[in-house]
A protein has these predicted regions:
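Hydrophobic positions on the alpha-helical face of helix-turn-helix-like DNA-binding modules
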Residues: 43, 67, 130-131, 143-145, ...
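Structural recognition of an alpha-helix C-terminal capping motif at a helix-to-coil junction
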Residues: 38-45, 49, 58-70
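Amphipathic alpha-helical segment used for protein-protein interaction
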Residues: 99-131, 136-145, 166
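Arg/Lys-rich amphipathic alpha helix in sigma70-family domain 2
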Residues: 53-55, 66-87, 101, 109, ...
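Residue-level preference for hydrophobic side chains embedded in well-ordered alpha helices
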Residues: 14, 18-22, 43, 63-68, ...
């Protein structure tokens, strides 16, 4: 198969399999609709341009997430410079959630996707990256590859982030 045809087939595979997830990723990283569309297009452009460099050392899916998150990280890096460190939530200060509580009890009836994404948006960029990949059902090993963290660090962050998000849905936090 000629190189261009192979690249087109790989890109079609990426957009078929991950197109909606890339749109969700851009929506979490950018609230402004016009900038969100630009970010999504930038992700697709980087994916297309980078396909010739894909050496199949990992799955196409893992590689796609790595490229997408690198583009988003650069996008966020620009925004972070204008945001003070006091605006971020520190997951290391979170107490573990009550393990006896059911997910329904922990989150209550006020659980909404909008609230979840608002809480995720307040996380530090690396924590946001981990939780977004987790929410897209990416395995911990692949999250570790994409983020450069160890698998253990990924598991710890996921546990702490889940506890933090659960706290955000407690009745006193919702008011």
């Amino acid at each position: 198969m000629p190189q261009r045809a192979k690249r087109e087939a790989q890109y079609r595979s990426i957009t078929d399999r991950h197109g909606a997830a890339i749109a969700r990723l851009a929506a979490v990283y950018e609230k402004d609709p016009a900038l969100r569309q630009d970010l999504e297009q930038d992700i697709h452009l980087h994916l297309w341009r980078s396909l010739d460099g894909f050496r199949e050392q990992c799955s196409l899916s893992t590689w796609t997430w790595r490229v997408a998150h690198n583009v988003c990280a650069r996008h966020v890096d620009k925004a972070v410079r204008s945001r003070s460190a006091g605006d971020w939530i520190d997951i290391d200060s979170v107490e573990p959630a009550d393990q006896r509580a059911t997910p329904e009890q922990a989150t209550g009836t006020a659980l909404t996707l909008e609230r979840l994404y608002a809480l995720i948006d307040r996380l530090r960029p690396i924590d946001r990256q981990v939780v977004l990949l987790y929410l897209e059902d990416v395995e911990a090993e692949a999250i570790a590859e994409v983020t450069g963290l160890s698998s253990g660090a990924v598991a710890t962050r996921i546990h702490r982030i889940k506890a933090l998000l659960a706290q955000g849905f407690q009745p006193e936090a919702a008011s």
